[in-house]
Amino acid sequence: MELYLDTANVAEVERLAHIFPIAGVTTNPSIVAASKESIWDVLPRLQNAIGEEGTLFAQTMSRDAKGMVEEAKRLNNAIPGIVVKIPVTAEGLAAIKLLKKEGIVTLGTAVYSASQGLLAALAGAKYVAPYVNRVDAQGGDGIRMVQELQTLLEHHAPDSMVLAASFKTPRQALDCLLAGCQAITLPLDVAQQMLNTPAVESAIEKFEQDWKNAFGNLNL
């Protein structure tokens, strides 16, 4: 299983990398824009934060296949081994096919249906990123869509994997993992929610109080 953080906040990546067993960091144009840093400045800093073995994801901005391929090559030259995120449009599918031939690893992003995700995988994307909460927000069933996509990839594109994205709660992320997803990416607030469980803190305080009442200190 691969766990990613969905952010361009270098300080938070450095902090959480000491806590979570993260495989890397995913970004998108909105996330990079929120950082107020040039993508060419922030990507090397993020790569340094996750280490050489960590995988970094960044997205193209062009709307046409030719431009996507050119931008993907530029990203790959700047950060060797980067996974290039390509929106799964008609032009995006063409770009994914071309980049597969170039040996550049891609992720099909902005996936709102299982059929759309399957096409990205068949075109050559290693990762496919369904938008779970955004599907829910549009009146759909994000988890069911992920379940369908996971089954389709297992049967028809086993070399590709679902990297589920767009979460508002830890429950959504866990449901994707229960559906068989091999990778998820968490926004910082959801990652923090997984750590902040009041009942855990209450239990620890009870252990400490019982120990102190018995032995007069908190030493082992």
Curated annotation (Swiss-Prot):
Q: Which locations, inside or outside the cell, does it occupy?
A: Cytoplasm
Report the top EC class in one word: lyase
- Report the main location listed first in the record: cytoplasm
| Gene Ontology BP term (one) | fructose metabolic process
List of catalytic residues: 85 (schiff-base intermediate with substrate)
Q: Does the keyword Transmembrane apply?
A: no
Q: What is this protein called?
A: Fructose-6-phosphate aldolase
What organism is recorded for this protein?
A: Salmonella heidelberg (strain SL476)
Q: In the UniProt record, what gene is named as encoding this protein?
A: fsa
